[in-house]
From Swiss-Prot:
Its EC number is 3.2.2.-. GO terms for biological process: base-excision repair. GO terms for molecular function: alkylbase DNA N-glycosylase activity; DNA binding. The keyword Isomerase does not apply. The keyword Hydrolase applies. InterPro entries: Formyl_transferase-like_C_sf (IPR011034), MPG (IPR003180), MPG_sf (IPR036995). It comes from the Bacteria. It comes from Salinibacter ruber (strain DSM 13855 / M31). PANTHER family: DNA-3-METHYLADENINE GLYCOSYLASE. This is Putative 3-methyladenine DNA glycosylase. Pfam families: Pur_DNA_glyco (PF02245). It is an enzyme of class 3 (hydrolase). Keywords: DNA damage, DNA repair, Hydrolase.
């Protein structure tokens, strides 16, 4: 499996979120094991979106430089860069930066269908049932051994990367509002493979 190029992510965030369905998330672990999952659920976030970490930042009208502090600044990185952060002090979440460099945007990978390296995933997660391994963003990060060390790394090169996969027809794709947010709930920016049992069980916001 070869990594998707940066050009795949150098596009509108909503397009990347939709097109990542069916692609593979791959981690070639230090142990020599390859962990692979088929992406079945994503969410999009952009700088004009109140649910985005970069929404509080502004630009200097003369220089165009981003003004403000906080982790949202990392969403202005080059497309294909990892944006990994911790929530509730417990769960790491994997996002990939989108849009041309200097424009904030990212896609959150919410769920994958595990395909390779299942025993390693079970060890990392401490659960046996395949359906419970990666059906949520915190779960998949734990199963794939993804933590803050991957923040700002390039997801267009090994060891952690996205690879081409199966295309998902539009009639197989469902959309909803995103999960776990209080702002921007009117945007149907969550995409998932309908009827796939590895999609996260949480309910959409709103």
């Amino acid at each position: 499996m070869e990594p998707l190029p940066a050009s795949f992510f150098n596009r509108p965030t909503v397009s990347v979120a939709r097109d990542l369905l069916g692609a593979r998330l791959v981690h070639e672990a230090p142990t020599g094991t390859r962990l692979v999952g088929r992406i079945v659920e994503t969410e999009a976030y952009t700088e004009d979106d109140p649910a985005c970490h970069a929404s509080h930042l502004s630009r200097d009208p003369e220089t165009g430089e981003v003004v403000g502090q906080g982790r949202g600044q990392d969403l202005f990185a080059a497309p294909g860069t990892a944006y990994v952060y911790l929530i509730y002090g417990v769960h790491w979440l994997l996002n990939v930066v989108t849009e041309p460099e200097g424009t904030a945007g990212a896609v959150l990978v919410r769920a994958v269908e595990p395909e390779e390296g299942l025993q390693d995933m079970r060890t990392e997660r401490g659960v046996d049932r395949r359906v419970d391994l990666t059906n949520g963003p915190g779960k998949l990060a734990e199963a794939f051994g993804i933590d803050g060390e991957f923040h700002q790394t390039r997801l267009t090169a090994r060891p952690l990367f996205f690879a081409d996969g199966d295309s998902v027809d539009d009639e197989q794709v469902a959309r909803s509002s995103r999960i776990g947010i209080s702002k921007g709930v009117e945007r149907s920016w969550r995409w998932y493979v309908a009827a796939n049992r590895f999609v996260s069980p949480a309910s959409p916001s709103g």
